[in-house]
């Protein structure tokens, strides 16, 4: 029964990550799996489940705070190109994304579709 609960939890983490961020589902799944595994191991060894939950919540709060402090706004076309290039693993794609974002502006929408035509 615990395995099913853990699997459902990991599935929910991946879905929520995809819904909110659109990326990072693999990382979220690996982290969730480790949390479930270690949590169950600690409970089996006698740890208080509520204490573990509170500890995890405090850790999430601190990590979120630290990430937000170190986050940087991406505003210029060059910054967008660099960030998108890293994310895509290809600077040419990063440049195309930056160009598209420059054309549509902050409130614009960019739709990406699969194509059989190379380079478009």
From Swiss-Prot:
The keyword Zinc-finger does not apply. Keywords: ATP-binding, Chaperone, Cytoplasm, Isomerase, Nucleotide-binding, Stress response. Gene3D superfamilies: GroEL-like equatorial domain, TCP-1-like chaperonin intermediate domain. It is found in: Cytoplasm. ATP binds at residues 23-27. Coiled coil: none annotated. It catalyses: ATP + H2O + a folded polypeptide = ADP + phosphate + an unfolded polypeptide. It holds the Pfam family Cpn60_TCP1. One of its GO terms (biological process) is protein refolding. Its EC number is 5.6.1.7. It comes from the Bacteria. GO terms for molecular function: ATP binding; ATP-dependent protein folding chaperone; isomerase activity. GO terms for cellular component: cytoplasm. Belongs to the chaperonin (HSP60) family. Forms a cylinder of 14 subunits composed of two heptameric rings stacked back-to-back. Interacts with the co-chaperonin GroES. Together with its co-chaperonin GroES, plays an essential role in assisting protein folding. The GroEL-GroES system forms a nano-cage that allows encapsulation of the non-native substrate proteins and provides a physical environment optimized to promote and accelerate protein folding. This is Chaperonin GroEL. The gene is groEL.
